[in-house]
Amino acid sequence: MRVAAYLVTLFCSLNLSSIVYAQDKHQDHDAGHRHHGAHVHGMATLDLVMDDHHLMMHLKSPLMNFLGFEHQPETEQQKSIYQDMLQQLAMLATLMEIKGSSCKAESIEVEEPFTDSDEAGHTDVDVSYFLSCEEPENITELKINLFDVYSNLETLQVQMVLPSGQQQLKLNQQRTSIRIQ
């Protein structure tokens, strides 16, 4: 897991300067505009870092996108939906198909979402995927399957650090693939 921590640190350091610049650049432009912050229903983020034979991904989403609610499950039906979500997110195939190379999940960590909700009751789920790929240079496409599984998800903001450089893009129900190379 040291490699995963390294990759997260690398990703954050590469993007910190652009975030600080963007914040400074638009500080005066904020008056009169409403900003949504990190918790927007219908939207999730996927950070992806590829280094050597490793592919690390971090998915963050409001629970509303995956469950249809953000509170602790109360009814038997809600408890069942919640357990199904945990099992689905712990399977790589729920997130994506990797085309061009064989990748194996070394570690998938789904964080308990109800330990960190804000005062307004907004709750996010965080999932970290750490993969080992046989021939990562042959990866041609990542097909994101989340939209097929979770109908409340409308947009996936993707930030990637690849050997070829950094890239940001938005995926939605019509555009579900990330071309690599």
Which functions belong to the PLM regions below?
Residues 20-34:
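Cleaved targeting-peptide boundary
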Residues 1-5:
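Positively charged n-region of N-terminal signal peptides that target proteins for export
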Residues 36-181:
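N-terminal soluble domains immediately following signal/targeting peptides that reside
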Residues 10-11, 20, 146:
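Intrinsic disorder/low-structure terminal segments
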